[in-house]
UniProtKB/Swiss-Prot annotation:
Its main location: periplasm. The keyword Signal applies. InterPro entries: Flag_FlgI. This is Flagellar P-ring protein 2. Residues 1-19 form the signal peptide. Assembles around the rod to form the L-ring and probably protects the motor/basal body from shearing forces during rotation. The basal body constitutes a major portion of the flagellar organelle and consists of four rings (L,P,S, and M) mounted on a central rod. The gene is flgI2.
Length: 376
């Protein structure tokens, strides 16, 4: 049985001691975002760890097309007018088909370089030592924005023989540092925007109000005007002053600090046993007990042998032993004035992670947990 691990992360700090954060760390500028680009290519130079061409026909077709584009004939000669040329069956394990992905940063210029991620498509066992040949990277609009090429860096490894294989990490995926050359800039500029819009990464009414007040308080002394107004609890619109550039303006606004408000929330991951409890979680007075019932089933078959020369047959008699054990449990009174008391009360019962998850869900069902419970 797989043991359930517990990672109980407590966000415990007084409201007065909550750290202030910069606006640029909790809000994004609308219109300035990354764009995903992707391309299909080949990694060559593998030491026998590439695709099996019989199992990955797309790799063979790509290799033939690449060689033909370079002027290398990889087709059989035509024997007659009725027998057209057919592709030669290639036999190599040094090539792997890959998908190349990258994030195109906003305002990046043509000629700059960026990192790319290379992931195997076929049955290659490792990309270690391989080199990606020139691959075009396209965005959702179909245009080519970058070209990638270079040696692949792989963190994992995979070695083995016919009877055993040892691997660590993921050797079928890697990265190429500065492996892509940007060929086209993303359209858009801050100078063309009449209004600058801030979008909160974690939308909240209180946080949006605090950001709005901080910006207008700063702008009242710096620009002698109120420049910010809220559109909703996620969006804040800024009116840029005329005598200052957008870069300097956003730099000044981004350095302002506020105290973001965090909602009362409990996040539960049943697969890993992780429980994350927010600082503002409250619980009404409730009594909790949790029983632990363990049932063990053991099969102990008995073989019955016949007597010598009796012409009997050997018979396997099934024998099952069932044991049930119910451990005693304690009753704890949980009165959650704060998170520390809640955790202290749960620890008094001596629960495992699965028990804590079950109790939190039951308390929420009873209406005593004053927080949102998110189960992943």
């Amino acid at each position: 049985m797989t043991r359930l691990l517990l990672a109980l992360i407590l966000v415990v700090s007084a409201a007065s001691a909550q750290a202030a954060v910069r606006i640029k760390d909790i809000a994004d500028i609308k219109g300035l975002r990354e764009n995903q680009i992707v391309g299909y290519g080949l990694v060559i130079g593998l030491n026998g760890t590439g695709d099996t061409l019989r199992n990955a026909p797309f790799t063979e077709q790509s290799l033939q097309s690449m060689l033909e584009n370079m002027g290398i004939n990889v087709r059989n000669e035509t024997t007659s007018t009725t027998n057209p040329a057919r592709p030669t069956t290639l036999r190599t394990r040094n090539v792997a088909a890959v998908m190349v992905t990258a994030d195109l940063q906003p305002s990046i210029g043509a000629g700059e370089r960026m990192d790319v991620t290379v992931s195997s498509l076929g049955d290659a066992t490792s990309l270690l030592g391989g080199t990606l040949v020139m691959t075009s990277l396209r965005a959702a609009d179909g245009a080519v924005y970058a070209v990638a090429q270079g040696a692949v860096t792989v963190a994992g490894y995979s070695v083995g023989g016919q009877a055993q294989n040892v691997s660590q990490g993921t050797p079928t995926a890697g990265r190429i540092l500065n492996g892509a050359l940007v060929e086209r800039e993303v359209q858009g500029s801050l100078h063309e925007m009449e209004f600058l819009v801030l979008e909160l990464k974690n939308p909240d009414f209180v946080t949006a109000t605090r950001i709005l007040d901080a910006i207008n308080r700063y702008a009242g002394g710096r620009y002698r005007a109120q420049i910010a107004f809220e559109r909703d609890y996620r969006t804040i619109v800024l009116s840029k002053p005329r005598h200052i550039g957008p870069v300097r303006f956003l730099a000044e606004i981004g350095e302002l600090t506020v105290e973001p408000d965090t909602p009362a929330r409990v996040v539960i991951n049943e697969r890993t046993g992780t429980v994350v409890i927010g600082r503002d979680v409250r619980i009404s007075t409730v009594a909790v007990t949790h029983g632990n019932l363990t049932v063990r089933v053991t099969e102990m078959p008995v073989v019955s042998q016949p007597a010598p020369f009796s012409r009997g047959q050997t018979v396997v008699v099934p024998q099952t032993v069932v044991e049930a054990n119910e451990a005693g449990s304690q009753v704890a009174i949980l009165s959650g004035v704060d998170l520390q008391r809640l955790v202290r009360g749960l620890n008094q019962i001596g629960l495992k992670p699965s028990g804590i998850i079950a109790i939190l869900q039951a308390i929420k069902t009873a209406g005593a947990l004053q927080a949102d419970v998110i189960v992943q």
